[in-house]
Amino acid sequence: MSRNASNAYLKNGNSTPSNDKRSPSSLSQRSKTSTRSSKPFLQRLFPSTWFKNESSSRHPLTSIKENDTQTIGRRPSMRVKLFGKDKSKASMSTNDLPSHPRSQSVMGFSSSTSQLTGTSNSSRTRLNKDMRRDFGMTSMSSITSSTPTPSQLPVRPSTSLSFFDDIPLGPSFSAETILSSLSISTSNNAMSKTTPAPPLVTTKSISADQDDFYTCKEEVSTYEGLNSQIELSPVKSRDSQNKSAKNLSTAYRTVSGESRNLMVDPKVSPYGNSRTPLRDSSNYLRDRRSINRQSSLSIPKSTSETTRKTLALSNGGIDQSRVSSDSFKVDDSSAKMAAIDIWEGSQHIVSNDKALSWLVTDKPYNKAVLKHYISLYDFENTDILQSLRMICGNLYVHGETQELDHFLGEFSNQWCRTNPKGLFCNPQIVHSIAFSLLLLNTDLHIAELSASERMSRNQFVENTYRSIKQALNDSFDGNEEKKNAFFLSSYKSFASNESCNSPAIHSLHGNLSPGKSAELKKLHKRSLSSKVLEEAFSSYWMSALKEMYHSIKVSMILQPDRYLDMNFDFNDTNKINNPSSTANQTRHFHSVSEIKKLPMGTDELEKSMVRPSTAMYINRQNENAVSIDKSRDLQGTVNTKEIRSRSALSYQNDRPLATDLPSVIYNHKHPNVVSPFYVHPYIKQGILKFQSKESHKFRKKEVWSTVLAVLQRDVFTLYNLNTPNLSYDPKDLDISKVGKPVIKTTIIASLAKPFPSSEDAVVLKSTNSLYFDLETSSQLKLRFAGPSPKDAQGWIDALNYWAARSSKVPLLGGVTNVDYGWARCTGQRAQKSNAQLLKTKTDKIIVHKWQPQPVNTIPSSLSLGEQLSAFNNFMKLLKKTNDEHQNLHKEMLVVLSSQPKSTFRRAVENWKYKSDYLQLNLVRLRVYISVLEKYKSQAQNS
């Protein structure tokens, strides 16, 4: 049976097919008669519950012009589900239906091609076949009848293009036009009804082979609007060779016969938390292949505010210049989501290299995002340089001078908000210093200048201080009273105990002499003249700027582009040998959580997995690199013996321990690949028992305290949990409620090991916990007890791993003319005759006290492979040096036998101290090499 005959058979309702071969004119006349029959076509097309046989006024549909026709041959891109209206308003009688000789268009699809184009039946049939061939459509073999039953609401019968081939009925109009012409009230809104909505066309009501309503056969997600629905279905790229093509979800909507599409990210709902309907898009779908070519979305002004801002956040390729931020009120929640997106570097809003320019754009929405972005950084107890390193390690701080000036202004405000008691600081002064530090970093490390052309320390201090004074005058507009009040408040903050214990203040005036510091503390007790205030202000900033210059000279302020290899695509082995492919991806270094597979034998692997952040390098003193709160010890009593390194007090990592930041809450997706402390955010924390050991002696009465230990890269912090009125949950600890840290130290050049050994380990009877010791570079020993032997070993591995990753190769000392007792045995005395050599043995020898080389407390920037190679090479040199030193012992005793006892004793002590130092370095190096090889092998084999 032919398709035309089948359609005629269905229309007439005959029991047998008809072989009627009449002309098109007779068929048209027959269609006119059938539309006036007792059961019109619309009643057969739509559910019977939509119509009632009651008189009503003439429907507005009769005013539709006949010229309102739709374009033929457009491939329908989706199914549109129509919400029915109230029966009292949606009911239509038979007399209300218009009768026209033109063909009827339903849901935007042309019902007849012959009436609009003047073609014959045969040409029309060929046209339909061509359309189905071009768009991959298949003919419908059967039509599902939809008869209402009491138990199930009736559904509209399925339709296809072949169904309307021979049914010319009236003028062209769409089903969307039908419903839009009806009066709509709140009670008619299907979304606000408590009762089920009118029957909808579902997937079950359409034949499986009816391909003209579907882009793919996969499950779709529906988003309901006011008068229609939008369905999102995953569409795969037709270009299989393009590996970078994204798997997008294309939303199709048919409105007034025009098929339009949206490009949205499949992971993010275009509505967010809102049910606001999505209105028309200005991107027309001309061809199915245009899905892959869509790169931006134009959001019209009529779109609701929530939808516009949510789309601006969820669409990765959105053209932000086309979104008018002035036409709607900024949504605070949307701006905060955008700020977190930029902070995480996911590039949904803007690429990382253009983030700063986008943030400082003069639009309300961008300003709101910048405000929330800056608030994500916690600069409390950090100095200006350290805070600048923190933000530069996460954001590409580059661009035009005007853009940098605007951004640094927001940075200065945030720094002053988080450090309200900063010494001699206000937003204008912080802004001037931050800008000068960026210029200094460019001059010393980035600009191609000779050594003589680079800025000297005196030039930097003078120029920056001149800028600080100008900023101070601009802040108070020459008002001397306000300026003096500002000075006095800074002095009072400095003199108070709370401010003296601040790491930021200690780090800024570490170079102040004790006399000046004592003088400043007494200034608030007597009346101060303006001259004295300005002198103190000048002395303070001169010293602070010198520290900052030296810190930047030793370690430059790094940008995120130094960590491009940390977001390595391990599934693409071509990128390992193609640096340009990695360099083109401007991503942040904290995307290590996306790692799924680890290649073997590549140095890029070690860099991407465990390279420590060097964005927070600062210059620290080597002595006593441990800070202990002098106001109280672990038992809450006053601790008279202060152990402090001012620069170590100011040290923090590039990820502050703020509980509201997303980086702190981290769930590793692949726990079998690496240890928890091995990946971002590189934090290990837990509750331990703690006992301090000083001068190699413990107290006679062992007193243990419960502490919260936090290890973040090379910074180890202890918080006392034995304070009164402190209730905590071991499973959910909030650091902000614990209080100030009692100990904060760097673990560079430190060593963690069980105490005293595996066979002599002492186990607490109550908790069955194992002891372990931590020896720092300042010779301070900290003893801990873990909850279990397994937990104790985990802490030992974590401490030794980050000590190995952060420590640089130590120095052994060079050739010197200082005699420590074995200078006569090392050949340092020139070629001499035997008589002269025998004579010198009887000379009086001046032996100096031997001291080891200071520990380099600047973290290492080498990758895991480079660090391991450096340690292996140094191990060979250290063994050779140790063997030579051991061989000097007997010869040294013979040479010093004729010397006084004091000289002999000091020489022997010096030899022993150096021997112990070499032995300690050998043990530490063996542990470092072992732990690095362990985790490198674990990463390669996983």
Curated annotation (Swiss-Prot):
GO cellular component: cell cortex; cell cortex of cell tip; cell division site
InterPro entries in the cross-refs: PH-like_dom_sf, PH_9, PH_domain, Sec7_C_sf, Sec7_dom, Sec7_dom_sf
Region described as Disordered: 1-128, 259-308
Record-level GO BP terms: cell growth mode switching, monopolar to bipolar; intracellular protein transport; positive regulation of G2/M transition of mitotic cell cycle; regulation of ARF protein signal transduction; signaling; vesicle-mediated transport
MF (Gene Ontology): guanyl-nucleotide exchange factor activity; phosphatidylinositol-3,4,5-trisphosphate binding
Start-end of Polar residues biased regions: 1-18, 50-60, 90-125, 271-284, 292-305
Matching Pfam families: PH_9 (PF15410), Sec7 (PF01369)
Domain PH: 681-804
Family matches, as CDD domains: Sec7
Name the UniProt record assigns to this protein: PH and SEC7 domain-containing protein C11E3.11c
Organism whose genome encodes this protein: Schizosaccharomyces pombe (strain 972 / ATCC 24843)
